[in-house]
């Protein structure tokens, strides 16, 4: 039968596996052989090494080499004594010797060390004395033995006297003792020779070893490695060789001279020793009394310490020999004090033996446990998760418990309904099936508590107390964790990776779903946690701090986006920062404050520059060199053929190709794709030229385009800001000022064509579109601009860019949008993705006849003669979004005309071109007398309800012109027009309703002012509130522009005069205001006087008719009462008694 003790070959181990059902491998066998070589015991089950001397456990040979400090067994002289020497020797008899001498020989030689036993006749009779053993003596010469007497001859018995016999006995004893001493000496020499031979390598190693101190304080020899010894031997051999080659011959030195001078002893000057002026230290060694305990004292000490540990629930460590130790702590379970030992499974290790308690330490652990609930009886149902390491009395447990081998039972876990002892060795299958009773919640709480206390703030000014319930605190902490992270388990790594991959918007959306419910839950169930509510509200405010007012951003860009001079440049930068909302960084917010400061300085010291320009001197030549595109030159973004690598951008570009491109089927030919129609006309693509003719004549004919009529250079070709040309937004001209006309553009397949200057750049379409031909749908040719911008977008931002372009830009642009809207959309995208501002655009052609922009794709154009737009980058194209830009092309459609193109999506702001305003008779800002006639129109409509209703319907913002004159504003307020405007437009136009409310408030304040100067100051102060309302988009109507101009003039006037008024100066404009007010009041007063006369006539006629009717049907008493009432009513109406109807009126009534 195979056993592991006689396992010398691998097949022995396999035979043992088959017999016992074990699974030992070759690795176990190798470790078993290694343990035999170093003299260790190998435990096959636990796969560990055990030292037979110190009983220490090691898991690998490296651990033995680094940590094993056990001393080897000492040698003894008995180890080298022969086995024969250890045998018991016969005791010689030293009594009288009777020697029988045969007759043949008179003299016989005695041999005490013969191998054959002596004859029974020859005996030594001695009592109580033993000198040594009678073993065989190692000798080379044989010892002659006494011959046996022959039977034939009779033996002679010699009787000697007693004295002679005694003397002979003494001589024999001396000889025997001398022989014994020689034997002992020989054996001793032999033993020491063997000892020297065995210790010679060890002693020779100590000659080169050094003495080192171990951790326990013992001094040991530390031998040097073999390579160091070899180097030392080689060096010694070299020195000996040199000594043999150049032997040293000693000589007597009788004179030493240093540089020919006197000897050193003569030149040396004797120096006096320095005097010590300090008191020497007197360090006295302190001798501590050594603590000595007997067994009784030691037990009492352990009892006292155990009581303290269990009561205070402190941690302790019982240390034994070398590295033997047991760690535990005091705890309470069901109100009983217990000892809880530190086990391996609580640290995350699953081992067959969970804890090893040395036999020498087990009584101490039991003694400490006895100070608690040692004598309490426990059942298995009282143990649950969290009970790991509890030390119980093995004789006091009842129920389903596993094997109990020791007096103490350490709880490990439960398997198959039984509670297992941590000291027991279990199989690997049980180890993995066992439900460990470690306290996961306690581990979490220990980590939380430790880190919480370690990071406690140091600047708390009060003493912290326990006011909240701990369970309620845990509930609120769980709510916060699930609100912010939303994990299925806090230990789940997949949830963490999923949370990490969320974008900023997705994360905000995810948190916003839960944060409202959490706030309501805390308010209702945990109202004391107000600090948590404040934190959640702050988080919600930060997450929702988005600026979705893209309309205001668009309007700002349209108004002043192209202005590069101060303060408009600061406003543009501020607008770009504000639109980011919560995505703006702290540095950007600091920059925003600086821009506000610059705007404030400008408003304080305002200046204006007048620029002039003329078409006669207009030149807008395009560069002959190609535009430098860094994205197409970076080696990291090019393949081995120099082509552009789309990377992740290729996948996200599908959002453009799927919705706004049409797949071309070459099998049906290209004829149906040749005509590119728009609402106002059409253009021929060069897609048919993809079928290339090899005939030179035919090929040359295909290179001839179809030209259209050239309108020449007109105001439609240029864009101005004031009188300054904005060249990127103008058509390209030659050096003589004539517009440059487009030529035929040859087609290509699967490319995106970029560049407006020099040679075009061909970029391969994304791999997602590989093998297919795409053409944009009608009305969506501007998608090529967004596709060109995608080239410069970083790969990790491609998803956000394409989603924003599709869901925000394209959704609002729709089909055939205006160039202003396209430029605004590009600016919004460039704000969130600044790298796209340098993106190179496809070539854009201008068709003034149909007021259309053509974005040329890879299929070119056969139609020629179009003007060429100079804008080559997104930054230059964005200038079309500025409202201050005076340009007809600003309102051209990218594929159609405003009156024939489909309606724009909801949310777009209606705009009118400058030429359209002139056609409608609208006066521009720079024309004189633009406010006065409209103010007169407002004054006429004050007391004409129908005219006022018509005015509010057509030009509602003319009401703001009333702030020019306090009298006009008061009349407008008294007429009730402001009140009617407020109520009528409350549902339809809240902006206009708010304007009427502000004017009503200003009228009330003006009515309380006593002087005209104060009234004008009140009106100028209220201009700021009206300006805030006018900043919202309101179109290009006449009333809006006039109101905006009037408010800005009043604000600027107030700001300029503020410093003078503050120091007490008065400006000359006060007299001017009096003249203006008098002139307006004169016209307005005449109208009021005429209205008063008409009112008197109507009122007298009405009273006369009433009086006649009453007199004809009343008695005299009632007539007199009626006369008094008529007089009183006249006084109330006219505030003068002489204006009341008198007796003539009554007399005429009586006569009638």
Curated annotation (Swiss-Prot):
Sites annotated Cleavage: 437-438, 895-896
Domain (Peptidase S30): residue spans on this chain: 292-437
Gene Ontology biological-process annotations: proteolysis; symbiont-mediated suppression of host innate immune response; transport of virus in host, cell to cell; viral translational frameshifting
Entry PTM: Potyviral RNA is expressed as two polyproteins which undergo post-translational proteolytic processing. Genome polyprotein is processed by NIa-pro, P1 and HC-pro proteinases resulting in the production of at least ten individual proteins. P3N-PIPO is cleaved by P1 and HC-pro proteinases resulting in the production of three individual proteins. The P1 proteinase and the HC-pro cleave only their respective C-termini autocatalytically.
GO molecular function, one term: serine-type peptidase activity
Record Gene3D superfamilies: Helper component proteinase (3.90.70.150)
Disulfide pairings: none
This enzyme's EC code(s): 3.4.21.-, 3.4.22.45
Every Peptidase C6 domain range: 773-895
Residue numbers annotated as active site: 345, 354, 388, 781, 854
GO cellular component, one term: host cell plasmodesma
Keyword Hydrolase in record: yes
Motif (Involved in interaction with stylet and aphid transmission): 489-492
Signal sequence residues: none
Short sequence motif named Involved in virions binding and aphid transmission, residue ranges: 747-749
UniProt comment concerning the protein's domains: The N-terminus of helper component proteinase is involved in interaction with stylets. The central part is involved in interaction with virions and the C-terminus is involved in cell-to cell movement of the virus.
Protein family: Belongs to the potyviridae P3N-PIPO polyprotein family.
Record-given protein name: P3N-PIPO polyprotein
Organism encoding this protein: Lettuce mosaic virus (strain 0 / isolate French) (LMV)
